[in-house]
Amino acid sequence: MHLREASEGPTRRGGDLSSIGRKKADCPICRRGRPRDVVAVLRSAWVSAPSRAALPGYVAVVAKRHVVEPFELPASSGFAFWRDVLLVAKALADLFSPVKMNYEIHGNTIPHLHVHLYPRFHADPFVGRPIDSREASFTRSKAERTRISRAIRRATAGSRSTRTVHR
Protein backbone atom coordinates (compact mmCIF):
# COMPACT_ATOMS: atom_id res chain seq x y z
CA MET A 1 0.00 0.00 0.00
CA HIS A 2 1.19 3.49 -0.77
CA LEU A 3 -0.07 6.39 1.36
CA ARG A 4 0.36 9.98 0.30
CA GLU A 5 -1.26 13.33 0.92
CA ALA A 6 -1.94 15.13 -2.33
CA SER A 7 -2.33 18.89 -2.50
CA GLU A 8 -6.00 18.43 -3.39
CA GLY A 9 -6.66 16.20 -0.39
CA PRO A 10 -5.92 12.81 1.04
CA THR A 11 -5.63 9.89 -1.36
CA ARG A 12 -4.53 6.28 -1.13
CA ARG A 13 -3.28 3.93 -3.79
CA GLY A 14 -3.47 0.17 -3.59
CA GLY A 15 -4.18 -2.07 -0.65
CA ASP A 16 -7.39 -2.35 1.29
CA LEU A 17 -8.76 -0.98 4.54
CA SER A 18 -7.06 -3.70 6.59
CA SER A 19 -3.67 -2.41 5.48
CA ILE A 20 -4.10 1.13 6.83
CA GLY A 21 -1.61 1.83 9.60
CA ARG A 22 -3.12 3.40 12.71
CA LYS A 23 0.15 4.32 14.38
CA LYS A 24 1.57 7.83 14.43
CA ALA A 25 4.67 6.51 12.63
CA ASP A 26 2.43 5.44 9.71
CA CYS A 27 0.77 8.85 9.44
CA PRO A 28 1.94 11.22 6.67
CA ILE A 29 0.57 14.23 8.58
CA CYS A 30 2.51 13.34 11.73
CA ARG A 31 5.67 12.52 9.79
CA ARG A 32 5.51 15.99 8.20
CA GLY A 33 4.54 17.65 11.49
CA ARG A 34 1.36 19.24 10.11
CA PRO A 35 -0.90 19.03 7.06
CA ARG A 36 -0.19 20.88 3.84
CA ASP A 37 -1.85 24.15 2.85
CA VAL A 38 -2.53 25.35 6.41
CA VAL A 39 -4.49 28.62 6.59
CA ALA A 40 -5.31 28.54 10.31
CA VAL A 41 -3.77 27.13 13.46
CA LEU A 42 -6.34 26.64 16.19
CA ARG A 43 -6.11 25.32 19.73
CA SER A 44 -6.80 21.70 18.81
CA ALA A 45 -6.58 21.66 15.02
CA TRP A 46 -5.06 22.96 11.83
CA VAL A 47 -7.25 24.15 8.97
CA SER A 48 -6.06 23.12 5.53
CA ALA A 49 -7.34 24.85 2.37
CA PRO A 50 -5.67 23.33 -0.69
CA SER A 51 -5.38 25.35 -3.87
CA ARG A 52 -7.51 22.78 -5.73
CA ALA A 53 -10.81 21.62 -4.30
CA ALA A 54 -14.07 20.01 -5.35
CA LEU A 55 -16.09 23.03 -4.19
CA PRO A 56 -15.46 26.66 -3.25
CA GLY A 57 -14.91 27.05 0.48
CA TYR A 58 -13.76 23.46 1.06
CA VAL A 59 -11.38 22.99 4.00
CA ALA A 60 -10.21 20.11 6.15
CA VAL A 61 -10.03 20.57 9.92
CA VAL A 62 -7.17 18.31 11.07
CA ALA A 63 -6.70 17.28 14.70
CA LYS A 64 -3.33 18.22 16.18
CA ARG A 65 -3.36 15.11 18.33
CA HIS A 66 -2.83 11.87 16.44
CA VAL A 67 -5.94 9.75 16.63
CA VAL A 68 -7.85 7.98 13.89
CA GLU A 69 -11.34 8.07 15.40
CA PRO A 70 -13.05 10.96 17.22
CA PHE A 71 -13.85 8.70 20.18
CA GLU A 72 -10.12 8.17 20.74
CA LEU A 73 -9.74 11.77 21.91
CA PRO A 74 -9.95 12.37 25.66
CA ALA A 75 -13.17 14.22 26.54
CA SER A 76 -11.60 17.67 26.95
CA SER A 77 -9.63 17.33 23.70
CA GLY A 78 -12.72 16.04 21.91
CA PHE A 79 -14.79 19.01 23.03
CA ALA A 80 -12.03 21.40 21.92
CA PHE A 81 -11.72 19.69 18.53
CA TRP A 82 -15.46 19.78 17.83
CA ARG A 83 -15.64 23.40 18.99
CA ASP A 84 -12.93 24.25 16.46
CA VAL A 85 -14.76 22.32 13.70
CA LEU A 86 -17.98 24.22 14.43
CA LEU A 87 -16.21 27.60 14.58
CA VAL A 88 -14.63 26.95 11.18
CA ALA A 89 -17.94 25.75 9.72
CA LYS A 90 -19.65 28.93 10.95
CA ALA A 91 -16.86 31.07 9.48
CA LEU A 92 -17.27 29.34 6.10
CA ALA A 93 -21.07 29.71 6.26
CA ASP A 94 -20.75 33.42 6.99
CA LEU A 95 -18.23 33.87 4.17
CA PHE A 96 -19.83 31.76 1.42
CA SER A 97 -23.56 31.70 2.35
CA PRO A 98 -24.08 28.06 1.32
CA VAL A 99 -27.47 26.36 1.41
CA LYS A 100 -25.94 23.52 3.47
CA MET A 101 -22.64 22.55 5.07
CA ASN A 102 -21.52 18.94 4.64
CA TYR A 103 -19.29 17.39 7.32
CA GLU A 104 -17.37 14.28 6.28
CA ILE A 105 -15.07 12.05 8.32
CA HIS A 106 -13.48 9.07 6.63
CA GLY A 107 -9.97 8.28 7.80
CA ASN A 108 -9.61 5.29 5.53
CA THR A 109 -7.18 7.18 3.30
CA ILE A 110 -5.01 8.94 5.87
CA PRO A 111 -4.99 7.47 9.40
CA HIS A 112 -5.38 10.82 11.20
CA LEU A 113 -8.61 12.46 12.37
CA HIS A 114 -9.75 15.17 9.98
CA VAL A 115 -13.15 16.59 9.10
CA HIS A 116 -13.87 17.69 5.55
CA LEU A 117 -16.13 20.75 5.42
CA TYR A 118 -17.93 21.28 2.12
CA PRO A 119 -20.17 24.32 1.71
CA ARG A 120 -22.96 23.22 -0.65
CA PHE A 121 -24.62 25.46 -3.21
CA HIS A 122 -27.78 25.28 -5.36
CA ALA A 123 -25.85 24.78 -8.58
CA ASP A 124 -22.76 22.93 -7.38
CA PRO A 125 -21.56 20.05 -9.60
CA PHE A 126 -22.56 17.42 -7.02
CA VAL A 127 -26.28 18.17 -6.64
CA GLY A 128 -28.08 14.89 -5.96
CA ARG A 129 -24.92 12.87 -5.41
CA PRO A 130 -21.99 12.61 -2.99
CA ILE A 131 -19.00 14.88 -3.36
CA ASP A 132 -16.11 13.24 -5.16
CA SER A 133 -12.91 14.98 -4.08
CA ARG A 134 -11.12 13.46 -7.08
CA GLU A 135 -13.19 15.85 -9.20
CA ALA A 136 -11.23 18.83 -7.90
CA SER A 137 -12.32 21.34 -10.51
CA PHE A 138 -12.22 24.51 -8.41
CA THR A 139 -8.88 26.29 -8.21
CA ARG A 140 -8.69 28.94 -5.52
CA SER A 141 -6.46 31.95 -5.61
CA LYS A 142 -4.15 33.21 -2.90
CA ALA A 143 -6.76 35.93 -2.24
CA GLU A 144 -9.43 33.26 -1.66
CA ARG A 145 -7.20 31.43 0.83
CA THR A 146 -6.56 34.76 2.58
CA ARG A 147 -10.32 35.43 2.78
CA ILE A 148 -10.83 32.02 4.39
CA SER A 149 -7.99 32.64 6.83
CA ARG A 150 -9.42 36.03 7.83
CA ALA A 151 -12.94 34.64 8.23
CA ILE A 152 -11.62 31.97 10.58
CA ARG A 153 -9.64 34.58 12.51
CA ARG A 154 -12.82 36.65 13.00
CA ALA A 155 -14.82 33.58 14.05
CA THR A 156 -12.22 32.47 16.58
CA ALA A 157 -11.37 35.92 17.98
CA GLY A 158 -13.57 35.50 21.04
CA SER A 159 -12.79 31.84 21.63
CA ARG A 160 -9.88 29.98 23.13
CA SER A 161 -8.73 28.99 19.65
CA THR A 162 -5.41 30.60 19.05
CA ARG A 163 -4.10 31.96 15.78
CA THR A 164 -4.65 32.10 12.05
CA VAL A 165 -1.97 31.95 9.38
CA HIS A 166 -1.83 32.18 5.62
CA ARG A 167 1.00 30.89 3.50
Region spans (language model):
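HIT superfamily nucleotide-processing domains
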Residues: 2-5, 9-167
